[in-house]
């Protein structure tokens, strides 16, 4: 085998591989001898078919099989000998005439074109300095949650005033209704004993408002228009009339924060409810703190590393992002600041995001590789099982999906690997804790107030990872700048959602047509 370097520019390499015809013929002869004892042909005793006859009958077919084995084998051998780490699957192109090669009249010649991984020295984690903002759970936060829970769980009773009572905002009106389009009753537009909480916004615009002032026994005709984006396409944008009969009026009772509230929520007493809320908020603050320190870390890593990126990797990442951006454009979901930008301007911004994602992905991968960080089978199995429980009754199908789809497993593995590398870096880095308010902790970088005095915690270990923590900073290969934009949160946010397996969650039961699309 002869290997000739045809091109070398930046991270691109092209090699020509030549396997001489004599070598191919020797391989063919060896293969024929290997299979000869098993060949069965009419007119010959088993295992006694002449080599020349086998070559004549099956030579080209056997040679084709040999070439199919040779291409990946020689490609890998070339990569190993040249000590190359491909950034993506090499492109293979055969340049010799297949007919002549199969007939043993020509050398087998093919080219390998590939992009290699950049060679760079990753930053020393011990020399990195990052900030971890932390916020304590305040009593006011718990009190606010208690009031909200009390209001949400309060009971309703028949409204005082008897037949003279009128429906007010916050009341529940019990009604029968029949919906009509152009005078005709439509499917799904009728219900009996429906409970309408005025002001909740659970029904289509105008429905609840027209019940204000209604009395028990009263009949009303409600004129409404279904939203243009209504879930039932046949009703979207259409005017409808609902004939309503009021059967009952209920008003909310006093919202009390007491032991009874806690018991209704499944806890022993009010103190237990307060403790549960504190733990929940502490967990949420911890997740947000983790996201912020990780974002700071990724920003520092991005600033520390400047090296050439494999064009195909960047192109593939950009294509993934742009598909979602294009969808956001079609749905008119771009942020106001982006709506007046040209397509070229938007593409330029998102290409920078793609480059950042790829750069950070390569940096974290290299740090992980050099420090023997890997994802164990136990960690992977745990993640798959956690995904499976999201699909009640279909857990087995989800697990089988991952067992049969290596790409899906790779998608599951990537964020786990990244979090382990981030944990490793944070254990060695100089982490400074900053006590901030809850508002500052959850504010975007461009909205955050001035930083308060810092409390240094040298080389403090990162907190334990939170289960199911949602973060705009994972995986790092999917990291976008801190710039806030709804479209960019969908298309360029730091984690592109993994594709769901074939087993889907069951759809909830359809609501009455009068209710708006959730």
UniProtKB/Swiss-Prot annotation:
Residues 170-255 form the PPIase FKBP-type domain. It is found in: Cytoplasm. The keyword Cell cycle applies. GO terms for cellular component: cytoplasm. This is Trigger factor. Residues 447-518 are annotated as: Disordered. Its EC number is 5.2.1.8. GO terms for molecular function: peptidyl-prolyl cis-trans isomerase activity; protein folding chaperone; ribosome binding. Belongs to the FKBP-type PPIase family. Tig subfamily. Pfam families: FKBP_C, Trigger_C, Trigger_N. InterPro entries: PPIase_dom_sf, PPIase_FKBP_dom, Trig_fac, Trigger_fac_C, Trigger_fac_C_sf, Trigger_fac_ribosome-bd_bac, Trigger_fac_ribosome-bd_sf, Trigger_fact/SurA_dom_sf. GO terms for biological process: 'de novo' cotranslational protein folding; cell division; chaperone-mediated protein folding; protein transport; protein unfolding. The keyword Cell division applies. Residues 452-468, 501-518 have a biased composition (Basic residues). The gene is tig.
